[in-house]
Amino acid sequence: MTNLFTRHTRRSLTALALLSGGVYAADEVNAKILSRSLRVFVTGGQVLWDYRIHFKGIERDHPDYHSKLQSLNQRIAHRLLYLCFENGGIYTKFGQQLATFNHGLPREYTMTLAQLQDQAKPVSFDKVKQTIEAEMGRPWNECYKEFDQTPIASASLAQVHHAVDALGREMAVKVQYPHLELQMKADIRVIKWAFQFTEYCFPDVQLQWLFPEFQKALLAEVHFDAQCTALLIIF
């Protein structure tokens, strides 16, 4: 019976692995959404565990409470920095906006997350080519005589490349990151859940007031790019 159960279990796990691999290969966008969401959940679990261990047996009136809180905030801030940078896109924008809330967040967060203002993770040139070709309706090298593969600037939602078009005009081309609007809906839901989870675990921490401001700014920027630039801005 045990051997039979083991064989069935092994076959089930193998089938599940093959199915998961097929889904991942067939739907790269959803796979990336899943991986980013899992990174959020893992980070949330790390923060909760760190808090419970760090403050075990320590009350607010303890003489070391304030210093321990500062060190905990710093560790959490570094975890958020890593999370936003690795997830990129909307998460980078989220971290950048958190860094501006000097009036509502501890200094450890605003100072650490401010690094995202100058550090955005660029996408590969293959993705850039796909975006250009989808927008222009023809191969990218028919649109440009020269196109620098390394971006001259990378922002949270787009990056800029130096190029020379077919007429010999030098220009900067702004390329919005691929699948941004598709990913945005899922990412926003996960970020909202993270706010709710934080307030549930830490009733004294009020964060949900930040979410409407973040969502409003994000939608305005994404829609501006989509309506006014159609993924490409030529300066």
UniProtKB/Swiss-Prot annotation:
Localisation per UniProt entry: Secreted; Host cytoplasm; Host nucleus
InterPro entries according to UniProt: ABC1_dom, Kinase-like_dom_sf, Mito_struct-func_regulator
Motif (RxLR-dEER): 36-60
Source taxon at top rank: Eukaryota
Matching SUPFAM superfamilies: Protein kinase-like (PK-like)
Secretion signal, residue range per the UniProt entry: 1-25
Name of this protein: Secreted RxLR effector protein 27
